[in-house]
Every structure is written in C-alpha cells, then in structure tokens.
Regions:
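Single conserved hydrophobic/aromatic residue that forms the stacking wall/gate
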Residues: 1-4, 8-12
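A generic "binding-loop/recognition-motif" signal
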Residues: 212
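Extended, subdomain-level signal for the structured scaffold at the beginning of enzyme domains
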Residues: 23, 27-201, 215-256
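ADP-ribose/adenylate-binding Rossmann-like module
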Residues: 202-209
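Single, functionally critical "micro-switch" positions that shape active/binding sites
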Residues: 4, 47, 209
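Short acidic (Asp/Glu) and glycine-rich catalytic loops that position anionic groups and cofactors
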Residues: 14-19
Length: 256
C-alpha cells in the first residue's frame, strides 16, 4: 500500500500542470476564452491580492497565454513570474474529445423556438414557421403581448405564453412576426426590448420581419449577422437555430 501511494503521488505530481495544459490547449478558441473569463470572474471575488497573484503564477505555468489573459482581465500589474514546477511540464497530445462546442452536433431536436405574434400578425407566415420548426423536431411556442390575439385572417388564437412571462432565455431561438403598429407599441415595452436584446446577447438565431427591424432591431443597435435573418429566409433560420452564433460573441461581451 505504501508503494502504491508513493506511485500515485508521483503521478499526481508529474501531471499537476501537464494535464491542465493539455485540457486547455485541446479546447476551441471560444472555449479557451470562456475558461479564461470564468477564472477572471472567480479570482475577482478573491479579496487577498497574494492569492490572486499565486493563482495567476500557477496559470502561467499551465499555459503562458492563459495566464496572461487572466492577468490582463484582472488588471494585474506587474504580472507575476510563473511557478517553477518540481518536474518538467509535458506537452501531452491534444484531445478534441475534451471539447464541448467543437464536437457538438447542430440540431433543433428536443428544443423550443419562440414565435412572437400580436394582433394582425400574418397567419400564413405563422403556420409556415410552426411547420418548419415541427419538421426539425423542435417545439414552436407562441408568445404574444396578450394571451388572446386575432391574426390578419380574422382567426383568434391563444398564445402559449404572455410576452412578459416568456423571456427569450427560455428558448433556443426566436421569430418575430408583428405588424408596424404592434412593433411601435412593443418598442416602448422594456420586456419586449429585453426579449430581443437577450436573445442576441445569448448568441441565438433571430428571424425578424420588416416592422421588427425598423422599430426594434435598428433602434436598439441589434446588429445583423449570419444568424439574424429576414423572416422569409425560413430554411436559413432553421439551420442557424441548430447552434449558437459564436462569431457574434466578441461583439456582445468582453471576453478575457
């Protein structure tokens, strides 16, 4: 047992920096940014400067770029020297299997897509989106300012959720099918503005109509990209809704 414990301690010592290095370097660039930002967040809560500095010194030994990113995120000056390891740090073979984003398969199956409608919304377009979302094995969820609304064909329908109680954080992608008069009203409603801005900040796909663009997206500086698509581009929206728009992230938040 003593020999086993000694061998185990040696293995732990030898891989103390090598394993974290291999893990970090195996990630995609966006995952590396998230790791660095998460460490910055956690260390920002540490009140003792020496502990923060010691942790950054450890990170510099794991990976110099990671350590410098965290130090910069904390505004740490001067940057501490890396820890001197007791054994040389190994550059182990990288493993893409450790990634989450990198190996994720685009899919809408089992997910939920919100469709924002209001009085006079286009009934035909609503049905097209419901059918496309269902065909992708996802669940369409009708959101409206009021539970009961009347579409442009005279049909009165019941929404699945009221806008104020159905924030976009609950959905994997969002669609907006509203007329100009309704868009003007919603442009003055904080919950509606947050509905779009949060979806954009959370890197979700957005399908927008002309009124949504004119009265909400443009005034709120919600920029277009590959996953913010015009309402008529149903097939494109479905494809983009299967994953997040990671290229958008540097434009909506400051990552380490």
């Amino acid at each position: 047992h003593t020999a086993y414990r000694r061998q185990r301690q040696m293995c732990i010592r030898d891989s103390f920096y090598s394993q974290p290095r291999m893990f970090y370097r195996s990630q995609t660039p966006i995952e590396q940014a998230h790791i660095a930002s998460a460490i910055v967040f956690e260390l920002s809560k540490v009140e003792t400067p020496y502990i923060r500095e010691r942790m950054v010194a450890q990170l510099l030994t794991v990976d110099e770029t990671l350590g410098k990113r965290v130090a910069d995120g904390l505004g740490m000056k001067p940057v501490p020297k890396p820890i001197e390891p007791t054994v040389p740090v190994q550059d182990l073979p990288l493993s893409p299997a450790l990634q989450l984003i990198g190996k994720a398969k685009p899919t809408l199956e089992g997910r939920k897509v919100a469709i924002l409608v209001a009085d006079d919304s286009n009934a035909e377009m609503l049905e097209k989106y419901k059918a496309a979302i269902t065909a992708a094995k996802a669940t369409p969820f009708i959101v409206a300012p009021k539970i009961s609304i009347t579409l442009n064909n005279g049909e009165t329908i019941a929404a699945d959720g009221q806008l104020a109680g159905s924030p976009s954080v609950l959905f994997d992608a969002i669609v907006s099918i509203i007329m100009p008069e309704q868009a003007k009203k919603l442009a003055k409603v904080s919950e509606a503005i947050a509905w779009f801005k949060d979806a954009h900040a959370h890197l979700k796909a957005i399908a927008y109509c002309g009124a949504t663009d004119e009265f909400i997206l443009i005034p709120q500086h919600i920029e277009k990209d590959a996953s913010v698509v015009a309402l008529k581009e149903i097939e494109t929206f479905i494809e983009k809704a299967k994953s997040r728009e990671w290229d958008r992230e540097p434009n909506v938040r400051d990552l380490a």
